[in-house]
Amino acid sequence: MDYRLLEIVACPVCKGKLNYDKDKQELICKIDRLAYPIKDGIPVMLEPEARRMTMEEVESCRSQS
């Protein structure tokens, strides 16, 4: 994942900042609790493709940032 891309790309729902989860290969929107998959190195920024995160997952991401 190119970290320069993270400066440009935003959540398609709220236009907020995304965080990269290297282990799960996802871009995380903490505001909307959505995890967008990265397939073959390409972020899939479609809301229907995003995984809904639990509150525990979001809190875990917050403690790691």
Curated annotation (Swiss-Prot):
It holds the Pfam family Trm112p. GO terms for cellular component: cytosol. SUPFAM superfamilies: Trm112p-like. Belongs to the UPF0434 family. HAMAP family: UPF0434 (MF_01187). This is UPF0434 protein VF_A0426. It comes from Aliivibrio fischeri (strain ATCC 700601 / ES114).
